[in-house]
Swiss-Prot record:
It comes from the Bacteria. NCBIfam families: pyrE. 5-phospho-alpha-D-ribose 1-diphosphate binds at residues 30, 75-76, 102-103, 106, 108, 128-136. Belongs to the purine/pyrimidine phosphoribosyltransferase family. PyrE subfamily. The keyword Transport does not apply. The lineage of its organism: Bacteria, Pseudomonadati, Pseudomonadota, Gammaproteobacteria, Moraxellales. GO terms for molecular function: magnesium ion binding; orotate phosphoribosyltransferase activity. Keywords: Glycosyltransferase, Magnesium, Pyrimidine biosynthesis, Transferase. Pathway: Pyrimidine metabolism; UMP biosynthesis via de novo pathway; UMP from orotate: step 1/2. Its EC number is 2.4.2.10. This is Orotate phosphoribosyltransferase. Its cofactor is Mg(2+).
């Protein structure tokens, strides 16, 4: 068996670029802002890419406290949390229960909206790709709390490090409102450091201008 490689931001950025997960250019976001980059974790759709992402989540979780259960919000978070559970077992010798939610509750079989490990009385870490407005995270936090869970924190792939409607970023708003930590594998600063190291002056200048306008 090949030993998984530890997560490094630069290696992940390069893989994301090669898969089209990360693109530099000009992209209009739902907010109406014109961003100099775009990140779509849904394109991490092969074994190598998913494995590297999961390794990043697993490495980060070993530095966190209160990891009773890991949880992936439907739908994108489901493969992320499953792969992370495997990475925790294979590379850190930690067997961590995992679960996810359905978009709609079942009224037959085992029923309900939650699938996988029981969360009642457990400290749960939520794993997702990004927090854009924070709406989806707030919804899943409510679901988990209603099931008796304590939210230990949130782990995302990318922190855009930009303001929401106010002076705080979406991640900062979630941290303040829900009083939980939110950690990211890579940040906008990591992307800028990568561009600087590669000598991509135009893309870096566009990122710097965007950060000056919207950054935190």
């Amino acid at each position: 068996m090949t030993t998984p490689v530890s997560f490094h931001p630069q290696a992940f950025i390069e893989l994301a670029l090669s898969r089209g997960v990360l693109k530099f250019g000009e992209f209009t976001l739902k907010s109406g802002r014109v961003s100099p980059y775009f990140f779509n974790a849904g394109l991490l759709n092969d074994g190598e890419a998913l494995s590297l992402l999961a390794q990043g989540y697993a490495d980060k979780l070993t530095q966190c406290e209160n990891v009773d259960v890991i949880f992936g919000p439907a739908y994108k978070g489901i493969p992320f949390v499953a792969a992370t559970a495997v990475a925790l077992s294979q590379t850190h010798n930690k067997s961590v229960p995992w679960g996810f939610n359905r978009k709609e509750a079942k009224d037959h079989g085992e029923g309900g909206i939650l699938v996988g490990a029981a969360v009642e009385g457990k400290k749960v870490w939520i794993i997702d790709d990004v927090i854009t407005a924070g709406t989806a995270i707030r919804e899943v936090v409510t679901i988990l709390k209603n099931a008796g869970a304590t939210i230990a924190g949130v782990l995302v792939a990318l922190d855009r490090q930009e303001r929401g409607q106010g002076e705080l970023s979406a991640i900062q708003e979630v941290q303040k409102e829900l009083e939980i930590p939110v950690h990211a594998l890579i940040t906008m600063k990591d992307l800028m450091d990568y561009l600087e190291a590669k000598g991509e002056k135009e893309a870096l200048a566009n990122m710097q201008a965007y950060r000056e306008k919207y950054g935190i």
